[in-house]
UniProtKB/Swiss-Prot annotation:
Residues 144-153 have a biased composition (Pro residues). It holds the Pfam family Ribosomal_S6. It comes from Solibacter usitatus (strain Ellin6076). The gene is rpsF. Keywords: Ribonucleoprotein, Ribosomal protein, RNA-binding, rRNA-binding. Residues 127-143 have a biased composition (Low complexity). Gene3D superfamilies: 3.30.70.60. HAMAP family: Ribosomal_bS6. GO terms for cellular component: cytoplasm; ribonucleoprotein complex; ribosome. Binds together with bS18 to 16S ribosomal RNA. This is Small ribosomal subunit protein bS6.
């Protein structure tokens, strides 16, 4: 069963752009040889890391989005793990997230349709504005009780 995955990995900052491009190309060919389809490759460039990793404070971020069998993902992760230029990597299966978001949208649409069907035909009576409430409120009498407070008794 094919699933949609995202793979984000961080390459050492001292690796040249040519090395990064060659590494990305080998990963892409490895994925396609395993029967996967690579949907998107984004190179985010050098960014500062949140914390130090192997004495490095920054790294080159690369994002893959692909559709593959789980065995293809295992092979990709193995290659990233043994590679010398990769600092960190993260694999996320996003097809479940997309299904969950689609389900939420359908539920939201159902609730909106139900609310529209149950809505009254005539508009609801308008609430008086704050300015109208202030002008209609009784004026305070000096030395008398404050309007709106219960009377002492």
């Amino acid at each position: 069963m094919t699933r949609i995955y995202e793979e984000l990995f961080i390459v050492k900052p001292d690796a040249s752009d040519e090395e990064v491009d060659a590494f990305v190309e080998t990963l892409r060919t490895q994925l396609t040889a395993a029967g996967a389809t690579v949907d998107k490759i984004d190179k985010w460039g050098k960014r500062r890391l949140a914390y130090r990793v192997d004495k490095y404070r920054e790294g080159t971020y690369v994002l893959f989005q692909f559709t593959s069998e789980p065995t293809g993902v295992k092979e990709l992760e193995r290659r990233l793990r043994v590679s010398d230029i990769v600092l960190k990597f993260l694999t996320v299966r996003i097809d479940e997230t997309l299904k969950r978001l689609d389900k939420r949208k359908k539920d939201r649409d159902k609730r909106a349709a139900k609310r529209a069907a149950n809505a009254p035909a005539s508009p609801a009576p308008a609430q008086p504005s704050l300015a109208q409430q202030m002008t209609e409120a009784p004026a305070a009498v000096p030395g008398g009780p404050m309007p709106g407070l219960p009377k002492e008794g």
